């Protein structure tokens, strides 16, 4: 296919997969779509439930986090995840599990007042704040299709988009109820 890399891996946390399917109403009889595959940061995460240690936890603000120092390498999390998201570093002598971190190393961090020893002006502070307030995938999305906020904010936005454009979207927010709900939601 056209997707590169083909699957999630210890170094690929988010995958945009290209899919083609038959549609007799489209020119050439084929339609295509792009589907994002990544950790959905479940409300009731199977990886957390399956872990015999405290390597996995769900944070109150939504993200499912992994602590490699607590991991014993059993990989039960891989077996439990319905989306096959946690992946092992198979090329390592002591493989750890890897997945989307929800950019926990940057989201919500305090904004510095200086950069490279120079005090930042208001415009620089605003630009810097904008870059650390959202996960990298949201910041980098060239189609501006991704949004970031609380689950309630995102559900409200999703339902508004469906109501505003019923011709464009299927009347369903994926992740609202599936497997107990997720903090990452999809429209199609």
Each predicted region: which residue ranges?
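Non-ligating segments of multi-cofactor redox enzymes
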Residues: 1-188
């Amino acid at each position: 296919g056209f997707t590169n890399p083909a699957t999630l891996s210890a170094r690929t946390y988010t995958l945009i997969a290209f899919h083609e399917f038959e549609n007799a109403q489209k020119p050439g009889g084929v339609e295509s779509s792009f589907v994002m595959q990544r950790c959905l940061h479940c409300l009731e995460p199977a990886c957390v439930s399956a872990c015999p240690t405290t390597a996995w936890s769900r944070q109150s603000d939504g993200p499912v986090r992994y602590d490699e120092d607590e991991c014993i390498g059993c990989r039960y999390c891989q077996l439990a995840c319905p989306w096959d998201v946690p992946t092992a570093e198979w090329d390592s002598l002591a493989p750890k599990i890897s997945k989307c971190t929800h950019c926990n190393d940057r989201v919500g961090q305090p904004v510095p007042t200086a950069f490279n020893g120079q005090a930042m002006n208001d415009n620089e502070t605003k630009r810097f704040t904008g870059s650390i307030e959202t996960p990298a995938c949201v910041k980098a999305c060239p189609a501006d299709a991704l949004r970031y906020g609380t689950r309630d904010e995102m559900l409200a936005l999703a339902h508004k988009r469906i109501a505003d454009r019923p011709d464009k979207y299927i009347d369903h927010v994926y992740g609202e109820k599936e497997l107990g709900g997720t903090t990452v939601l999809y429209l199609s």
